[in-house]
Amino acid sequence: MRYKIALDCDDVLNNLNEAVCKVFNEENGADITEDTFTSYDIYKCLPFEDAEKYTALWRREDVWRSLTPVYHSQWGAKKLIDNGFDVYITTATHWENFPWKVEWLQNYFPFIDESHIICIRDKSLLAVDVMIDDNLDNLIGNIRCNRVVLEKPWNKNAHDEAYSIKRCTNWDEIVAAVEEFYKQDEELMSN
């Protein structure tokens, strides 16, 4: 059985919040950045009206078309595939955004088969060996696998030590963590 890796899409493969901040600032004369978001809950970080405007931008095609990949995410995903791992993209996106997301993934990650793109709200239902996400709630709920959080301002101050979640700051660290998990799991299986 091949080693299965679940990669979250938004803010792990793409720079969604960076793109949304840019459009929000242009349209509202504001100056917010990713650092504004010290919680995954947008409504805790912005006044209600601004939070409503911000979240509405997630449903605009022009925002999805402006997304760029997270630095080294293409290299990292390809390296995992080249190392023989099964890589799946997992996303809790709104259904109306899904076609734009799939199109974006096909443009920037053409080496990932479309059948490996999974739209799912409850990621704890996934049977994978490693899950990589920026939302700690997705990781804390899935105790059956190795877990990696890509550090972002909204998860930086969370207390996740008790959950055995590996914290990484970039894709080089993510690839190294997956390779280490694989090595450890192989050793366990051989004993």
What does each model-found stretch correspond to?
Residues 104-120, 162-179:
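Structural recognition of alpha->loop->beta junctions
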Residues 32, 39-78:
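Metal-dependent phosphoesterase signature
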Residues 132-169:
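Acidic, Mg2+-coordinating phosphoryl-transfer loop and its flanking beta/alpha structural elements
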